[in-house]
Regions:
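Long, internal low-complexity/basic segments
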Residues: 148-165, 173, 312-314, 323-326, ...
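Catalytic-site neighborhoods of secreted/periplasmic enzymes
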Residues: 1-73
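Histidine-centered active-site microenvironments of extracellular/periplasmic hydrolases
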Residues: 110-116, 186-236, 243-246
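A long, amphipathic alpha-helix that forms part
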Residues: 78-92, 155-197, 257, 339, ...
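A short beta-strand-to-alpha-helix junction
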Residues: 73-74, 137-139, 167-175, 193, ...
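Short beta-strand segments
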Residues: 8, 99-106, 198-203, 230-231, ...
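Active-site regions of oxyanion-processing enzymes, predominantly non-cytosolic
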Residues: 14-39, 75-135, 189-198, 339, ...
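C-terminal cap/loop subdomain of S1 sulfatases and analogous C-terminal strand-loop tails that border
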Residues: 28-39, 43-46, 205-211, 217, ...
Length: 357
């Protein structure tokens, strides 16, 4: 079988199940987040004159961004990349099939990255969101920005200086992670493993950067739910593919590519190998997303969400993804789309029942 290794933040629950891996998962903080700075009554451990301006004894969050003139490995993700590179060398020597998971933290908050990545961008030239307003008739359940409000140095999302700094920090973090991924891929090439290794790059969510006035991920808008997915298969022609895929589709896809039997009746996902072979192919009609009390269905044309209280719908939104990519107009009241909306909501309820079984 495969020798499986985990580095960094692979799952949100950092403690991982030990029996999922061939060896203990590697974390920069071996004990998860670490009690010393997770317990509010121990905040004095890292208090100093500088940090005292930002420390909140209950949340223990400093500023939402940082640009320090340091090496890549001063921050966590640089060390994750170097550990992954070391593992590639070790796995090559072991001469076994392997699955190596490399979990980077950024571009998650706080937006901390070495200064050289901030220097790639001129803050005054960064374009701010063209739609910093809340769409009309958007359900009250659609909110965001709560996470960033918990950081020190935060003033208001309406402040242009904040917007430019936050967006600058996000860009810097993306470039920082891009560089770390590049180091890992370069080592894969150097070791002669690239032509026998499948690479999957994904992010677990999107992020609002001022669109609709939001700065975060906690809602069912497209900026929060659409995430990167890049797959490199040896000898497979590159390109951009359309269609609808979900992260639950990755496992059956890898099984098919590696000729590993798929557990019968145990998977919700569907292989998207046909899309990798022909970008015009489709493998499924819908993607389903759930956040708190909201349920979202996404097709190639529409994104529809409902919020339920018991069996009653207490909030609705529908966006036409072809004519309104930015999701500026909630079409829930559109008479011309009534049948489409009804069908999408039916599919949501069917999926919800399936998941509750």
């Amino acid at each position: 079988g495969y020798y499986v290794v985990s580095n960094g933040k692979v799952f949100h629950n950092i403690t991982d199940h030990a029996d999922s891996w061939s060896e203990a998962p590697w974390r920069v903080h071996p004990d998860g987040y670490g009690k010393d700075w997770a317990e509010y009554n121990k905040w004095e451990l890292w208090q100093n004159e500088e940090s005292s301006r930002y420390i909140h004894p209950k949340t223990l969050r400093g500023p939402f961004c940082e640009s320090a003139d340091v090496s890549d490995t001063t921050y966590i993700d640089g060390r994750v990349a170097q550990k992954t590179i070391a593992d590639l060398r070790r796995l090559k020597e072991m001469k076994v099939p392997f699955f190596l998971a490399c979990g980077f933290w950024k571009p998650h908050l706080p937006f901390n990255a070495p200064k050289k990545y901030w220097d790639l961008y001129q803050r005054e030239k960064i374009q701010l969101a063209s739609n910093p307003y809340r769409p009309k008739a958007l359900p009250k359940q659609v909110t965001s920005s709560g996470e960033i409000r918990g950081y020190g140095k935060f003033t208001t999302t309406k402040d242009e200086a904040f917007q430019r700094e936050a967006k600058h920090g996000y860009y810097a973090c993306v470039s920082y992670i891009d560089a770390q991924i590049g180091l890992v891929l370069d080592e894969l090439e150097r070791l002669g493993l690239a032509e026998s290794t499948i690479v999957v790059i994904l992010g677990d969510h999107g992020w609002h950067l001022g669109e609709h006035g939001f700065w975060g991920k906690h809602n069912l808008m497209n900026h929060a739910t659409r995430a990167p997915l890049i797959v490199r298969v040896p000898h497979c022609k590159g390109g951009k593919a359309g269609g609808v895929v979900e992260f639950v589709d990755i496992y059956p896809t890898l099984c098919e590519l590696c000729k590993v039997p798929v557990p019968e009746g145990q998977l919700q996902g569907k292989s998207f190998v046909p899309i990798l072979q022909d970008s015009g192919k489709k493998t499924k009609q819908y993607a389903f997303i759930q956040w708190q009390g909201g349920y979202n269905i996404v097709s190639e044309r529409y994104s529809s969400a409902i919020w339920l209280k018991g069996d009653s719908v207490v909030g609705r939104m529908v966006f036409d993804r072809q004519s309104d990519v930015a999701e500026n107009e909630n079409k829930v009241g559109s008479v011309s789309l009534s049948e489409e909306i009804k069908e999408l909501e039916t599919q949501i309820r069917i999926k919800k029942l399936q998941l509750e079984k």
